Regions:
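Intrinsic low-complexity, repeat-rich intrinsically disordered segments enriched
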Residues: 1-59
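Extracellular jelly-roll beta-sandwich "head" domains, especially the C-terminal globular C1q domain
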Residues: 38-197
Length: 197
């Protein structure tokens, strides 16, 4: 076994490929070594419904959640103006973790009795990530679901919610910035690519 000491390793051709090891090999990064650069769980984003009045929705209807504010989205992967969806960018294929929070308000009606949350990939609905019946609620309550999706470049993910009960409900939002306590009670979604996928 030998040791190679260098400050920089590059391919012979510009934009070429450098391969370390082959199938079945193990490459070990010793304890205490910091790995920087390309190995990261990006893209990453956190968006929410910024209107404190919320998004008015009809009871029992699977409705796309209009996330219209980026708390952070350094790669610009979430459309907060038109389609309200995440799109996998070039080089971003892999498994993604999503955490969606749905804050429901009964809009002063007769309350709501069941809340569901689901995603759709390329327009096709997935099974519910959250679906629960509750005692009739008239106050704003928060429901959370998590999901891991295997996505390819160009795939887009949309987020939907349903509240059953009175004729109209609201998906509650929160005005203010990152540090506002109301953000914890706001309709939001965070997502990132899992390292190693």
């Amino acid at each position: 076994m030998g040791t190679i000491k260098a400050t920089n390793i590059e391919p012979i051709a510009d934009n070429g490929t450098v391969t370390l090891g082959s199938s079945g090999d193990t490459i070990t990064v010793p304890t205490g070594v910091t790995v920087g650069g390309g190995i990261s769980n990006t893209p990453v984003f956190f968006v929410d419904q910024s209107n404190s009045a919320g998004q008015l929705v009809s009871a029992g209807v699977n409705t796309k959640i209009q996330f219209n504010r980026a708390i952070f989205d350094p790669s610009g992967v979430f459309d907060i103006t038109t389609n309200y969806r995440f799109t996998v960018p070039s080089g971003g294929a892999g498994k993604y973790f999503f955490k969606t929070t749905l804050a429901v308000n009964d809009n002063g009606g007769g309350g709501y009795t069941r809340v569901s949350l689901n995603t759709a990939v390329n327009g096709t609905n997935n099974p519910y990530v959250f679906d629960n019946s509750v005692n009739t609620l008239t106050v704003t309550s928060v429901f959370t679901g998590t999901e891991v999706l295997d996505l390819s470049v160009g795939d887009y993910v949309e987020f939907f919610g349903i509240a059953y009960g009175a004729s109209l409900h609201r998906f509650a939002g929160a005005s203010g910035g990152w540090s506002t306590p109301a953000l914890a009670r706001s309709t939001s979604v965070a997502g990132f690519r899992l390292i190693g996928t």
